[in-house]
Swiss-Prot record:
Source species: Dioscoreophyllum cumminsii (Serendipity berry)
Protein name: Monellin chain B
Domain of life, per lineage: Eukaryota
Alphabetical list of Pfam families matching this protein: Monellin
Biotechnological and industrial applications of this entry: Natural monellin has not been mass marketed to the food industry, primarily due to the challenge of large-scale purification of the protein which is relatively sensitive to heat or acid treatment.
Amino acid sequence: GEWEIIDIGPFTQNLGKFAVDEENKIGQYGRLTFNKVIRPCMKKTIYEEN
């Protein structure tokens, strides 16, 4: 899938913007790996630290 840079609010201040693969619903930035697509309109910010 295509990679889209999205803003995840408060986290952006510390971690910057995240690249999210819309097709696979997984994004990676630094040491964070997301198991859900995170959008500004979402309240859920589920992630796992490697």
